[in-house]
UniProtKB/Swiss-Prot annotation:
Broad enzyme group: oxidoreductase
Function: Specifically catalyzes the NAD or NADP-dependent dehydrogenation of L-aspartate to iminoaspartate.
Record-stated family: Belongs to the L-aspartate dehydrogenase family.
Active-site residues annotated for this sequence: 224
EC number: 1.4.1.21
Gene that this sequence comes from: nadX
GO terms for MF: aspartate dehydrogenase activity; NAD binding; NADP binding; oxidoreductase activity, acting on the CH-NH2 group of donors, NAD or NADP as acceptor
Keyword tags: NAD, NADP, Oxidoreductase, Pyridine nucleotide biosynthesis
UniProt protein name: L-aspartate dehydrogenase
Catalytic activity: L-aspartate + NADP(+) + H2O = oxaloacetate + NH4(+) + NADPH + H(+); L-aspartate + NAD(+) + H2O = oxaloacetate + NH4(+) + NADH + H(+)
Organism: Burkholderia thailandensis (strain ATCC 700388 / DSM 13276 / CCUG 48851 / CIP 106301 / E264)
Functional pathway: Cofactor biosynthesis; NAD(+) biosynthesis; iminoaspartate from L-aspartate (dehydrogenase route): step 1/1
InterPro entries: Asp/hSer_DH_NAD-bd, Asp_DH, Asp_DH_prok, L-Asp_DH, NAD(P)-bd_dom_sf
Length: 271
């Protein structure tokens, strides 16, 4: 059992926009101690320079000086295989932000098996969407339908299959660029899949969750809408998210959900 007065020993996986924002938020929190950061080898020197000697910066789980109590992943899909699986297997509880990767059943199974083997818990962060707790609760009574609608400015879809469907730089009216299952959305739009996958895993699953993605020149932010109905009644939630100040491509709420996960881990009263 953890000493009630000792800070939770944390390893952070990734130190990009989200990781840096999380670190700044908890750096002086007496209940938490970010003692380790895992990043790719080519980033180690830069991160060491930013954090100094108080944090052990390494490129692999094997290089950790000891096993941390808790790990937070905010590094991208590849980190789940390389770092989260071995940490779970070693008995470290982990919270992950890269939910879109879990549309890969083999990866989801590998994470679940590693957690079972290590007696650890894998927590999926709610990220950029709210209402996940209500959706997961509603699932207990039975859900009839869940739909996720994601709406972004046209230029937010650059580098995706949407470029073959319309001229994203010259749009004057909204256009649906994808309609199908959450699993197919994750496959075709992997960099935009985290919210759809989170909604799906909390509700009726990746194949039954309906997804609609829209390029809309009338919006200036990413807009997420979830509609569900079931034995509980009906729900509809819409969020228009702001990005992190230093990274316009990253949802601020995603970073806040990671901060909340760390503080919940250290708290004796959690909501």
């Amino acid at each position: 059992m953890r000493n009630a007065h000792a800070p939770v020993d944390v390893a952070m996986i990734g130190f990009g926009a989200i990781g840096a924002a999380v670190y700044r938020a908890v750096e002086h929190d007496a209940a938490l101690r970010v003692a380790h950061v895992i990043v790719p080898e080519h980033q180690c020197d830069a991160v060491r320079g930013a954090l100094g000697e108080r944090v052990d910066v390494v490129s692999s789980v094997d290089a950790l000086a000891y096993r941390p109590q808790f790990a937070l992943e905010c590094a991208g899909h590849g980190a789940l295989v390389d770092h989260v699986v071995p940490l779970l297997r070693a008995g470290t509880d982990c919270a992950v932000a890269s939910i879109g990767a879990l549309s890969d059943l083999a990866l989801l199974d590998a994470l679940s098996e590693a957690a079972d083997e290590g007696g650890a818990t894998l927590t999926l962060l709610s990220g950029a969407i709210g209402g996940v707790d209500a959706l997961a609760a509603a699932k207990q009574g039975g859900l009839d339908e869940v739909q996720y609608i994601g709406r972004k400015p046209p230029l937010g879809w650059l580098g995706t299959p949407a470029e073959a469907l319309c001229d994203l730089r010259a749009m004057t009216a909204e256009q649906t660029i994808f309609e199908g299952s959450a699993r197919d959305a994750a496959r075709l739009y992997p960099k935009n899949a985290n919210v759809a996958a989170t909604v799906a895993l909390a509700g009726v699953g990746l194949d039954a969750t309906k997804v609609r993605l829209i390029a809309d020149p009338a919006v200036t932010r990413n807009v997420h809408r979830v509609v569900a109905r079931g034995a509980f009644g009906e729900m509809s939630i819409e969020m228009s998210g702001k990005p992190l100040p230093d990274n316009p491509k990253t949802s601020a709420l995603t970073a806040f959900s990671a901060i909340r996960a760390l503080r919940n881990r250290a708290s004796h009263c959690v909501i």
